[in-house]
């Protein structure tokens, strides 16, 4: 096999392309970073019957995970942000039921005055069982919020179902959990 040499500078003005791992940056500088500087995950550790805000049994994920940055703080299911900025929040719920038909709702709620909460997003599902086996569910909600004051902007999570539903908590894996990613500055 023959290899040819190509002169890439002929007919090119301005910046010369660079191959084989070069940066092609002939002048200027790179400022800042696009890497995440805050990432955190929390999960619910015990099974429960969903009936409103999830206020108990939260722990920071400790299985094959290490937070980036300061991380969120939690008290009775209310999460406080470590810094201002644009944040992505994911809320995942999983569970099982033994009834005939069940509606499932999960919501992310935020306050900007440390008092009244409103929903950022809602996700839901309606499950209908056709046999006598246990049926499992998974619902995901996601929102992007602008946190401008860490003293007053907080978030909590809502999960509600009809009866005979069990939300599956766990300590060794994520079944009911929240993910927090700081995407950038306000």
Pin down the residues of each PLM region:
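Short, intrinsically disordered N-terminal pre-domain segments
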Residues: 1-13, 185-186
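Extracellular jelly-roll beta-sandwich "head" domains, especially the C-terminal globular C1q domain
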Residues: 32-186
